[in-house]
UniProtKB/Swiss-Prot annotation:
Domain of life: Eukaryota
Function comment: Antimicrobial peptide.
Protein name per Swiss-Prot or TrEMBL: Temporin-1Tp
Species, as recorded: Rana temporaria (European common frog)
Any Gene Ontology CC annotation: extracellular region
Amino acid sequence: LVPLLGNLLSGLL
C-alpha cells in the first residue's frame, strides 16, 4: 500500500 500511495502522490505532483 505504501508504494501505491507514493505513486499517486507523484502523479499529482
